[in-house]
Curated annotation (Swiss-Prot):
InterPro entries: ADOMET_SYNTHASE_CS (IPR022631), S-AdoMet_synt_C (IPR022630), S-AdoMet_synt_central (IPR022629), S-AdoMet_synt_N (IPR022628), S-AdoMet_synthetase (IPR002133), S-AdoMet_synthetase_sfam (IPR022636)
Gene3D superfamilies registered for this protein in UniProt: 3.30.300.10
Protein name: S-adenosylmethionine synthase
EC number: 2.5.1.6
Organism, scientific name: Psychromonas ingrahamii (strain DSM 17664 / CCUG 51855 / 37)
Binding site for ATP: 15, 164-166, 230-231, 239, 245-246, 262, 266
Subunit structure: Homotetramer; dimer of dimers.
Gene: metK
Residues annotated as binding L-methionine: 56, 99, 239, 270
Amino acid sequence: MSRDLFTSESVSEGHPDKIADQISDAVLDAILKQDKKARVACETYVKTGMVMVGGEITTDAWVDIEEITRNTVRNIGYTSSEMGFDADSCAILNVIGKQSPDINQGVDRSDPREQGAGDQGLMFGYATNETDVFMPAPITYAHHLVKRQAKVRKNKTLPWLRPDAKSQVTFAYDHGKIVGIDAVVLSTQHSEDIKQEDLVEAVMEEIIKPVLPAEWLSERTKYFINPTGRFVIGGPVGDCGLTGRKIIVDTYGGSARHGGGAFSGKDPSKVDRSAAYAARYVAKNIVAAGLADRCEIQVSYAIGVAEPTSISVETFGTEKVKKDLIIQLIREHFDLRPYGLIEMLNLIQPIYQSTAAYGHFGRNEFPWEALDKVEALKAGAF
């Protein structure tokens, strides 16, 4: 048996970069609740005792940036200086400006269907049938591990846990099929008073075993739990955090290509975000319809232009119909113009803060995960 290994990582909601992402998206959500036509590009920087919120925002809404920031940090769990960051005492700097009118004139149109892209760029969407959520297994289970860490921290099952954590899972494949998990890494911030051996046992029993399927674990599986032996200093004290620095964690864990644009803090007129969601929607429906076992979609745009400059499909030799037919079906059933995809996926709603931790894809509560095009694609293909 040949064994190919593939690894993906995730980070918890208390990781500094994810704190920044969640603040940026919390600001976006608050504005969208009041102004559906707002233009938002909100960036956040966090470091010891300080949060700086900046970017370009054009809106008629008024939101309390300080209150939004403190509530977000508090809900993550940073509530005392003992753990290195305190929602109630950190300094908050607001350096937000307005979006350039040069961009506005290229995006806004009298006919909204002709709305231009907010920038040039290329975006990818991906799906695979190796999990029931049509996502690669390594990133899926890496997310599950850090999500479980947050759960047992917040419900006090493991009260000595702190918000910052990272996971990494290496899967073994034989000719593209999962045959096991080769390695698991989980590093979690903790209080001073927990012994390393007690931490290792508790993490194994309360986080790893409840999450990872037993049939994929064996005596060959390697476990690395807090491998440095100590992780007391974490969060923004340990590292500064910036919006948009976890773009592979946010997407497919390296299993698919990435156009380079981050998501958090951007309203749906920014195709970096909305077109990446639409490309995932297209790829997932193609795989769910049985047109391919794996599918990667690339779309590209020019600033101020409505129609995509390109649509391409990669199926890695797993297609069940010709790729030309798949592209034809995409053009028939999916409107990938900026306004079209916003309408198609109902993107102008305050749903974005919850995307900002544990991945933007493979979570069925989001509209771009719907499988409502499957029957139409089947009818057109077979």
